[in-house]
Regions:
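Helix C-cap/helix->beta junction micro-motif
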Residues: 48, 86-90, 137
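Catalytic helix-loop patch of NAD(P)-dependent Rossmann-fold dehydrogenases
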Residues: 74, 78-82, 102-140
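N-terminal Rossmann NAD(P)H-binding glycine-rich loop of SDR-like oxidoreductase domains
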Residues: 3-20
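Rossmann-fold NAD(P)-dependent oxidoreductase module
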Residues: 15, 19, 86, 133
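Adenosine-cofactor binding site in Rossmann-like domains, unifying the SAM/SAH pocket
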Residues: 21-43
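SDR active-site strand-loop-helix element
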Residues: 6, 28, 53-57, 94-99
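NAD(P)-cofactor binding segment of oxidoreductase domains
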Residues: 67-95
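NAD(P)H-binding glycine-rich loop region in Rossmannoid oxidoreductase-like domains
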Residues: 39-75
């Protein structure tokens, strides 16, 4: 299986590259594809035609996101949306990673996928918006 993995210099992306060695891996770094540029994302996916897209890449500077909301939303909302659109176009699975920052932390139990979101800051809002965009597109 040919798997395209974004953010391979990050903790999760790097770990995936180490663990999925039985597959043909296409590791994408910031230098390979600027996630603020939708056309670059489309081009990379079209070029490699993967069987699966895994997106652990994210804007993760929680505090700095308050000062750079546009950048946070470009990377955490817009980029995953483009990836989900391409995955749907190619009829392939798309795996995207969430964060606990999509919740407000007021629940006294463990959060689950179906819990209502209520992000308090820009980082959580941008990640939540990305998830909503992916859900609207649907797919595998």
């Amino acid at each position: 299986m040919k798997i395209l993995i974004t953010g391979i210099n990050g903790q999760v992306g790097h770990a995936l590259m180490q663990q999925l060695t039985d597959h043909e891996l296409i590791g994408i770094t910031r230098q390979d594809c600027d996630l603020t540029k939708p056309d670059q994302i489309r081009q990379v996916i079209d070029q490699h035609q993967p069987d699966l897209i895994i997106n652990p890449a994210a804007y993760t500077k929680v505090d700095q996101a308050e000062d750079e909301p546009e950048l946070a939303f470009q990377i955490n909302r817009d980029a995953p949306k483009v990836m989900a659109e391409k995955a749907r176009e190619y009829n392939i699975p798309f795996i995207h990673f969430s964060t606990d920052y999509v919740f407000d932390g007021k629940k006294n139990e463990v959060y689950v996928e179906d819990d209502p979101t209520h992000p308090l800051g820009v980082y959580g809002q941008s990640k939540c918006a990305g998830e909503e965009a992916i859900q609207e597109i649907g797919g595998l």
